[in-house]
């Protein structure tokens, strides 16, 4: 059975842009993610799926610029939940080297920050 594996790293950084579109919000982030290096990624938020308008789906796509000079790309998706001006995300990604990860991420729209924890998937 597949389960969440060990904690790989924590990450923190900034939102570099936010666009409110007719189909949803698009957020670009730049974070420092330890062994993954500098990670640049785009989050695209779908419409809410609950009556309260507090949760919905999202996709993620990005690239890691590792300290050793290598790069990895990744794609994935998950869910988000609003908490005031903050948004909690949980997503699964697949990296170009075959790694699968699970992340819990916190966005603060007022502070324009992104932070969270990345776990391996077994």
Locations of regions flagged by a protein language model:
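Beta-strand-enriched cores of mature, soluble protein domains
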Residues: 1-122
